[in-house]
UniProtKB/Swiss-Prot annotation:
Keyword Membrane: yes
UniProt key word Cell membrane: yes
UniProt cross-references to Gene3D superfamilies, sorted A to Z: PPE superfamily
Record protein name field: Uncharacterized PPE family protein PPE36
One GO process term, biological-process aspect: response to host immune response
Primary subcellular site in the record, as a coarse category: membrane
Leftover remarks: Protein expressed in vitro is immunologically active and reacts with antibodies from tuberculosis patient sera. Could provide a specific complementary diagnostic test for the presence of and infection with M.tuberculosis.
Species annotation: Mycobacterium tuberculosis (strain ATCC 25618 / H37Rv)
Gene that this polypeptide is encoded by: PPE36
GO CC terms: plasma membrane
Length: 243
């Protein structure tokens, strides 16, 4: 943890007032909520497609299809839950920022204290302003204490929010067998043909904003979508290959 107690209120107050604010964090939270909703929709659509397919075709291949697809459906469910939880934690971090900013001493008040103290010291030739100078210094010490305490609490709240975010797993491997893979591909085409483009545009790229949390989307040369949270990959989605 940074030593906020070593920093005067001029620095602590100015930093939090001039920062990017909670906007980038809230944008990331909205993106994760949208992603959670889309994953849930994908799961429901996939399950519906499976039900429709199984109503018209039953046999060994259909049973194999169920066995191969259920882990993917479960992964969609779990990942949607984790994405929603991440949105909650990001919102908590944004709220912590707003509370900290409201509790910080305004920079203008700190500057006014320093200017008034300097002026009083400059004209205190006979000690007539000594009491007022002491009062100003006491006020300044209180500002120092208040800012340092607020920043320390804010740091702890943000760290707790980040550490509470979920770990995202890669989607399960799909069947390598040609017939089963073809059937799975048919189901995916039923609902997920444009899934990759949807996911890419769901989560905003807030890496361009400065803030304690970064969230970007990346697509590698193999077509795998990766969501990077604080520099670490947290979720990936890869389209099922076409046959």
């Amino acid at each position: 943890m940074p030593n906020f107690w070593a920093l005067p209120p001029e620095i602590n107050s100015t930093r939090i007032y001039l920062g990017p604010g909670s906007g980038p964090i809230l944008a990331a939270a909205q993106g994760w909520n949208a992603l959670a909703s889309e994953l849930e929709k994908t799961k429901v659509g996939l399950q519906s497609a499976l039900d429709t397919l199984l109503e018209s075709y039953r046999g060994q291949s259909s049973q194999a299809l169920i066995q191969q697809t259920l882990p993917y459906v479960q992964w969609l469910t779990t990942t949607a839950e984790h994405a929603h939880k991440t949105a909650i934690q990001l919102t908590a971090a944004a709220n912590a920022y707003e509370q900290a900013r409201a509790a910080m001493v305004p920079p203008a008040m700190v500057r006014a204290n320093r200017v008034q103290t300097t002026v009083l010291k400059a004209i205190n030739w006979f000690g007539q302003f000594s009491t007022r100078i002491a009062d100003k210094e006491a006020d300044y010490e209180q500002m120092w204490f208040q800012d340092a305490l607020v920043m320390e609490n804010y740091w702890e709240a943000v760290q707790e929010a980040i550490q509470s975010t979920s770990h995202f797993e890669d989607p399960p491997e799909m069947a390598d067998d040609y017939d089963e893979a073809w059937m799975l591909n048919t189901v995916f085409d039923y609902h997920n043909e444009n899934a990759k483009e949807e996911v890419i545009h769901l989560v905003p790229d807030v890496n361009k904003e400065r803030g304690p949390i970064e969230l970007v989307t990346k697509v590698d040369k193999e077509g795998t979508i990766r969501l990077v949270y604080d520099g670490e990959p947290t979720f990936s989605y890869k389209e099922h290959p076409k046959f």
